[in-house]
Amino acid sequence: MEVFFLSLLLICVLSVSIRLYLLLYKHRSHFTGPNLPPGKIGWPMVGESLEFLSTGWKGHPEKFIFDRISKYSSEVFKTSLLGEPAAVFAGAAGNKFLFSNENKLVHAWWPSSVDKVFPSSTQTSSKEEAKKMRKLLPQFLKPEALQRYTGIMDHIAQRHFADSWDNRDEVIVFPLAKRFTFWLACRLFMSIEDPAHVAKFEKPFHVLASGLITIPIDLPGTPFHRAIKASNFIRKELRAIIKQRKIDLAESKASKTQDILSHMLLATDEDGCHMNEMSIADKILGLLIGGHDTASSAITFLVKYMAELPHIYEKVYKEQMEIANSKAPGELLNWDDVQKMRYSWNVACEVMRLAPPLQGAFREAITDFVFNGFSIPKGWKLYWSANSTHKSLECFPQPEKFDPTRFEGAGPAPYTFVPFGGGPRMCPGKEYARLEILIFMHNLVKRFKWDKLLPDEKIIVDPMPMPAKGLPVRLHPHKP
């Protein structure tokens, strides 16, 4: 009997050993080939993902990049991230190469967790779904279309400050910034303006956003499991809104051009077919994520830096009050007013340089190619990092110094300032983000000055930068 159990144990150990060997062999086989970039591949499945993520959790995501640039004396290096063989392209030359070769040598890539959270994309892929969205969005997000949204956005901003900021001594900025940008997205994408209706989505939506780019382990208690549950709840609510909008369009109670939702319901593909409800719900869900998450981070860091730099605040205040004093009582901001906010936008750009809401993004090599003398195999994932240029001494003198004058005149050199990406895949919502950020700034500074309550509050990047405690501030209302 003892011999039997000993034999069984040996078989189990041998089986596990063989599996581990095969896993290690498969992992290393992804990194074989002539003249690959220098770098370390780490352990199977894990690779260097924990180091990559932990530098963000500690508030310094650029450390992962700059440490390896220094170690390998190269602006391109190999690694393994999110279970995939990868190369990191750092610097303006790497940005230019990736942005200029979209759909030629590379195309967009998202972790598998994205396809699992958005089930309609599994019929094609999240890449194909993104292409469809980029065809739908331009007419709603181009400057001509955004002009008519300016007054609406100012109206919502005024309501937001009246509800959440006025008559308060202290506030926590980050959750309020998320509430504002989410309210805007709901209003402009789906014509939902009632705060109670917006609030119904708010909590599950933040659960979804925080668990979207995580290790895709669907077990109770994991961020990914919570994200799937939240997405199912939101999708159910969205489908109810879609069904009602169909009825309203049929009965002429809704306009064909009032928002993105109406356009999606009426749009057809090359074969004349309409999108199904699930596909529309997933697209709206994706838009809500892209339409508010990054802007709320940028707004929060604007508040942070203006609290720390009173001379910057005073210049922004002067510019915004000149605009405010030119308006009649009760008159909303218009497009021309926003175009006058030049210094304010330079400040916002400097904030996004130092704390880019979009830390970077992945591409996938669709063919073998050579960059900087190194071979990049087909199928490898390629990561570009905003911080690799934003905080580079070569691209920005005194990179740690807050200096909005960097954006005067011609501004930074091409491919060095990339908070919205670049090339064909530059964020289509760039102008929309500019509007919501500037309108928030206008309504904030004309009401308050403020102080940080936690002078040394830690910054976390996961995946966007955010203050660990949400940036609590003490408000000082301006005297009438």
UniProtKB/Swiss-Prot annotation:
Domain of life: Eukaryota
Subcellular localization(s) per the UniProt record: Membrane
Reaction(s) catalysed by this chain's protein: beta-amyrin + 3 reduced [NADPH--hemoprotein reductase] + 3 O2 = oleanolate + 3 oxidized [NADPH--hemoprotein reductase] + 4 H2O + 4 H(+)
GO molecular function, one term: beta-amyrin 28-monooxygenase activity
Tissues in which the protein is found: Expressed in leaves, stems and fruit skin.
Enzyme class, first EC level, given as a word: oxidoreductase
One GO term (biological process): saponin biosynthetic process
Alphabetical UniProt keywords: Heme, Iron, Membrane, Metal-binding, Monooxygenase, Oxidoreductase, Transmembrane, Transmembrane helix
Residues spanning the membrane: 3-23
Family of the protein in this entry: Belongs to the cytochrome P450 family.
UniProt-recorded name of the protein: Beta-amyrin 28-monooxygenase
Lineage: Eukaryota, Viridiplantae, Streptophyta, Embryophyta, Tracheophyta
Gene (UniProt): CYP716A17
